[in-house]
From Swiss-Prot:
One of its GO terms (molecular function) is cobalamin 5'-phosphate synthase activity. It comes from Escherichia coli O45:K1 (strain S88 / ExPEC). The gene is cobS. It comes from the Bacteria. The lineage of its organism: Bacteria, Pseudomonadati, Pseudomonadota, Gammaproteobacteria, Enterobacterales. This is Adenosylcobinamide-GDP ribazoletransferase. Joins adenosylcobinamide-GDP and alpha-ribazole to generate adenosylcobalamin (Ado-cobalamin). Also synthesizes adenosylcobalamin 5'-phosphate from adenosylcobinamide-GDP and alpha-ribazole 5'-phosphate. One of its GO terms (cellular component) is plasma membrane. It is a multi-pass membrane protein.
C-alpha cells in the first residue's frame, strides 16, 4: 500500500519522491491507486493552507490566497489546469467529436482554454479571500477541497470509457470498480466531516459530487467518454465548487 501511495504521489504531483519508494509497482496496477487520491489531495491542500496562514498576517488575505493557489499549481506542475484548458479548448470549439479530441491534444493554448484558466484561478483566489474574511478555517477548507476534488474524480472513471485509443487517463478510466469508487468517496467524506464538522464539509462534498457527476455525463455525451484532460478539469472544477459551497 505504501508503494502505491508513493507511486501515485509521483504520478499526479511534482513533489520529489525517491524512486526506490515506488519501485517494483507495475504501471497496469496504478488503477488501484485511486483510493490514495483523497489522501494526496489532503497533503497538497494542507501545504497550500499552511502557506496561506503564514502569509496572511504579513500581507493580508488576498495576497495570501494568491500565493497559496500558486503553491498548489507548482506542486501539481499545472497538470490539472492544463487538462482544464485543453478540455475547454476542445469542447467549446463546437466541432465534431474527433476534431474536439484532436484539439485537446494540441499543446497550443486556445482562447477558451485561456479564459478557463483565468476564471478558475481568479475565482479560487477570490473565494479563499472571502472565506478568510468570514472567519472560515482556511487550512481545513483547502485540505478538504483538494481531498474531495480528487476523490470525486472517481465519478469520471467508474463505468466510463476512455475516449481515445491511448493515453495516461487510460490507466484509471473504466478500470476502477464499484468497491474502489465507494472506498475513495468514503475516505473523502471522512476527511470532509473531520476537517469541517457540523455537516458543513459533507454538505459541500454532496454539492461537489452532484456537479462532477453532471460534468461527467455532459463530457461523455460530447466526447464519447473521458480522457486524462477531463479528469484534470474535474479536479480543478471540483476544488472550486467545494470552496464555493462553503460560502
Amino acid at each position: 500500500m505504501s508503494k502505491l501511495f508513493w507511486a501515485m504521489l509521483s504520478f499526479i504531483t511534482r513533489l520529489p519522491v525517491p524512486r526506490r519508494w515506488s519501485q517494483g509497482l507495475d504501471f497496469e496496477h496504478y488503477s488501484r491507486g485511486i483510493i490514495t487520491f483523497p489522501l494526496i489531495g489532503l497533503l497538497l491542500g494542507a501545504i497550500s493552507g499552511l502557506v496561506f496562514m503564514v502569509l496572511q498576517a504579513w500581507c493580508g488575505a488576498p495576497l495570501a490566497a494568491l500565493f497559496s493557489v500558486l503553491v498548489l499549481v507548482l506542486m501539481t506542475g499545472g497538470f490539472h489546469l492544463d487538462g482544464l484548458a485543453d478540455t475547454c479548448d476542445g469542447v467549446f470549439s463546437a466541432r465534431s467529436r474527433d476534431r474536439m479530441l484532436e484539439i485537446m491534444r494540441d499543446s497550443r493554448l486556445g482562447t477558451h482554454g485561456g479564459l478557463a484558466l483565468i476564471f478558475v484561478v481568479l475565482a479560487k483566489i477570490l473565494v479563499l479571500s472571502e472565506l478568510a474574511l468570514r472567519g472560515e478555517p482556511i487550512l481545513a477548507s483547502l485540505a478538504a477541497a483538494c481531498a474531495i476534488s480528487r476523490g470525486t474524480a472517481a465519478l469520471l472513471m467508474y463505468r466510463h470509457r476512455y475516449a481515445r485509443e491511448e493515453g495516461l487517463g487510460n490507466v484509471f478510466i473504466g478500470k476502477i470498480d464499484g468497491r474502489q469508487t465507494c472506498v475513495t468517496l468514503g475516505l473523502a467524506a471522512i476527511f470532509a466531516a473531520v476537517l469541517l464538522p457540523g455537516m458543513h464539509g459533507v454538505a459541500a462534498m454532496v454539492v461537489t459530487m452532484v456537479a462532477i457527476f453532471i460534468l461527467g455525463q455532459l463530457l461523455k455525451r460530447t466526447l464519447g467518454g473521458q480522457t486524462g484532460d477531463t479528469l484534470g478539469a474535474a479536479i480543478e472544477l471540483g476544488e472550486l465548487v467545494f470552496l464555493l459551497a462553503l460560502l
